[in-house]
């Protein structure tokens, strides 16, 4: 007999969602849906607002990654005004964005993913959380807490508060860097390096236990989209867009943000409030693509920092071409963190 299984709400994720599974008479899953159940409405309630309010409003899209939305909105305002921000402001924005990336990735890897990797996917849900991780492997738990604290404290130092900082504005940032704050950030960096390297070593030791999941879970051909620098390297803040296919062929390169709508569209499905972006020439759903850490490492030719370059070369050996398994988002996040710490040290050092 066919059956519908609903998991509502889904826990251990950033946001609100549910999963619906439909099975046939043999108990095999025939359909699976992930539904975003929260109405946001940002596009609508921003209509008619003064442009200079946009960064502050857009930051409220998320309490975990507000800096990305803050900077993207400020850059849109600057494009409207045809202004270029000072180089020092660009560097400070990059540092702030990398701090957010570090704390957000630490949340995802250590708080949301590592309980499954350390304790097992069938472990008691009451124990399968960051507290269970800290109990079973105190060093790993403290490393995760330390990396998240590093990123959050750096955001607070630069932006005056950890969530929704108002430091980034159209035209740059509201104030220059205080040397005392710079020195405090530099003092935190050695511990941050030690924590991410501990996590990378641990992940590489345990990943073989999940080889079946790594090889089969959400492992499918598809496109990858992200930003790269002028030299094709890893970039988070000021790059241009590159799109590759499942074989690694470049479909689009050096695409400006203003050209996005020419090449990409958004589909709507009845089961979710989330929109579904796609590459127009391939249509929907064939033109769907992945973004984020896995996409960034797949599209980038190099990281541009010594330690992350070593890790990226090793990562690219996982497949003959782009790494397609979504399980490897975990690995990619740790490399992103390592790269971010290196760039922050370079900016402030």
Region locations from a protein language model:
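Active-site bordering "gate/hinge" segments
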Residues: 1-349
């Amino acid at each position: 007999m066919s059956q519908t299984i609903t998991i509502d709400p889904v826990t251990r994720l950033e946001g609100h969602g549910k999963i619906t599974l439909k099975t046939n008479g043999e108990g095999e899953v025939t359909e699976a849906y992930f539904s975003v159940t929260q109405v946001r409405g940002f596009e609508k309630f921003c209509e008619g607002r003064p442009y200079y309010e946009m960064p502050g409003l857009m930051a409220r899209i998320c309490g975990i990654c507000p800096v990305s939305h803050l900077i993207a909105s400020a850059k849109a305002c600057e494009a409207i005004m045809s202004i270029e921000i000072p180089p020092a402001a660009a560097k400070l924005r990059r540092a702030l964005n990398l701090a957010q990336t570090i704390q957000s990735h630490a949340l995802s890897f250590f708080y949301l993913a590592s309980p499954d990797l350390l304790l097992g996917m069938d472990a008691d849900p009451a124990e399968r959380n960051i507290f269970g991780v800290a109990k079973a492997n105190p060093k790993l738990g403290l490393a995760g807490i330390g990396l998240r604290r590093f990123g959050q404290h750096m955001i607070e130092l630069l932006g005056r508060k950890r969530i929704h900082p108002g430091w980034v504005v159209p035209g740059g940032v509201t104030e220059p860097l205080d040397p005392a704050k710079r020195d405090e950030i530099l003092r935190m960096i050695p511990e941050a390096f030690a924590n991410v390297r501990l996590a990378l070593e641990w992940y590489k030791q345990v990943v073989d236990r999940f080889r079946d999941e790594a090889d089969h879970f959400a492992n499918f051909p598809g496109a990858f989209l992200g930003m790269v620098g002028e030299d094709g390297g890893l970039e988070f803040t000021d790059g241009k867009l590159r799109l590759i296919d499942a074989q690694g062929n470049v479909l689009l390169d050096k695409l400006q943000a203003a050209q996005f709508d020419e090449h990409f569209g958004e589909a709507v499905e009845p089961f979710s409030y989330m929109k579904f972006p796609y590459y127009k020439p391939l249509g929907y759903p064939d033109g769907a693509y992945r973004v984020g850490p896995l996409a960034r490492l797949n599209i980038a030719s190099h990281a541009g920092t010594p330690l992350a370059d070593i890790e990226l070369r090793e990562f690219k050996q996982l497949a003959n071409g782009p790494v397609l398994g979504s399980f490897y988002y975990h690995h990619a996040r740790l490399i992103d963190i390592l790269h971010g710490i290196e760039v922050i040290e370079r900016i402030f050092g």
